[in-house]
Structure formats: C-alpha cells, structure tokens
A protein has these predicted regions:
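Domain-level signal for soluble alpha/beta catalytic cores
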Residues: 1-193
Length: 193
C-alpha cells in the first residue's frame, strides 16, 4: 500500500490524506515497472483504504497482466472504516483476477469472506496473520501465536469462499505446511460450501 512508503503506520489505517487520483498517480510508475516483468501476475496487498481500492482497480485495468488486490480488514470493514460492500461494488465486474484478505486475524478474514463471497464476483484468497497482534506503542508482537486457530480454520475459510489460503505476518514455513495439509484434507473430504 501507499502507506508503507511514509512509514507512519498509515498502511494499517489508510489515513493518507490523498485522493484516489493522487494514489493512482503514485502507484502508476511502480505498476508500469512490475507489469513489464516476467511475473505471472501482479499483487497489491494490505490495502486499508477504499480510495486505494479505487485507485488500484483503475490502474490495474491499464495492463494486460492479471492482477489480484488484497485488502486488510478489521471488524467486517476496511481498516479505514469503509464497508466491504463498497469494496465489492468497486471490484465487481473489474478486470481483477482475484480479491484477497490479508494482514488480519483469522476471525476477521472469515467475516470478510462471508461478506465478499456473494458480492464480489471474484475468486477469493485469504492469508491472515499468525494470531499475534502488533502493539504500535511497544513496537512488538504481543499475545499468543495461535497456529491452531489459522491451521484449524482452513475448512471454515474454504467454506466461506477462499480458493487460495496462506499466511501473512508471523506465519512460518511450518504453518504453511500445516495449512497445505489441511487444504489437501479439504480436497479429500470435501470442505466446499
């Protein structure tokens, strides 16, 4: 997200003070460089702002390369407080190859999937954090790494509409291996909706 540039934590709240057009202008040269690589697709992740969703959806339309947009959520909304229904309205019918949810709790990912699955018209992906939370004041991870929460929730994530599942902050290779095992179990047992 744009917010990772200033480094003031705005990547988690979307309080950029920029318009959608200004965000598009900021993203454009970076996307042009990435679109001209051998990458199979483009992925913009941890997007906290409805204005950045608008800007990136518009900018991705300029390129032939498939693109996925992944948002960060809390309590059934984007981090800037915008509704997920508004996100779905922007991306529905767009050229995007998928819509993701990342850098959040597993519970928040499940809530977002349940809202977006019937509305977005796109394949969905979910890659939540390990279960710990970032304390901005103490500048450290706090709480328990709840591996079982993420790993054990794979069937729920699939049932909620996730077609691709992974992990974000503090997720280890061991978590990913366990997620892959759970996903394989879903394929064998039929965890679909």
């Amino acid at each position: 997200p744009y917010g990772a540039g200033p480094g003031q934590g705005t990547e988690y709240n979307g309080a950029y003070g920029l318009t959608s057009a200004e965000l598009a202008t900021w993203h454009r040269p970076r996307l042009e460089i990435l679109a001209n690589t051998h990458a199979d697709f483009l992925l913009a992740e941890t997007i906290p702002s409805i204005l950045e969703v608008e800007a990136l959806t518009s900018e991705f339309a300029r390129f032939e390369k498939p693109a996925i947009l992944s948002i960060t959520v809390a309590d059934g909304k984007l981090r800037d407080g915008s509704s997920l229904e508004d996100v779905a309205a922007i991306v529905r019918g767009s050229q995007l190859a998928g819509l993701g949810i990342n850098c959040c709790t597993t519970a928040d990912a499940l809530t977002a999937l349940r809202i977006l699955a019937p509305l977005s018209g796109l394949p969905l992906t979910a890659y939540p954090n390990s279960g710990e939370s970032w304390d901005r004041v103490a500048r450290q991870w706090v709480g328990n790494q709840d591996e079982l929460s993420l790993v054990d929730s794979v069937p729920q994530l699939v049932k909620a509409g996730a077609r691709f599942i992974g992990g974000c902050c503090r997720v280890t290779p061991q978590h990913i291996a366990a997620i892959a095992e759970q996903t394989q179990g879903c394929q064998n047992k039929g965890c679909q909706k």
